[in-house]
Swiss-Prot record:
The gene is rpmH. Residues 1-20 are annotated as: Disordered. This is Large ribosomal subunit protein bL34. One of its GO terms (cellular component) is ribosome. Coiled coil: none annotated. Transmembrane segments: none annotated.
Length: 53
């Protein structure tokens, strides 16, 4: 039987990436909350660099 989690960096970036977060009001709230908390990475795509493209 095939497992449910089939990892893909493209899907990961498109669903939880910085651009998607910034596109909605609640997404911006998440980014701001993570900034305030002092998170090392704000979103999935921010710590990927250009290697994931």
């Amino acid at each position: 039987m095939k497992r449910t989690f089939q990892p893909s960096n493209r899907k990961r970036r498109n669903k939880h990436g910085f651009r998607l977060r910034m596109s909605t009001k609640n997404g911006r709230r998440i980014i701001n909350a993570r900034r305030a908390k002092g998170r090392h990475s704000l979103s999935v795509s921010s710590d990927m660099g250009t290697a994931g493209r």
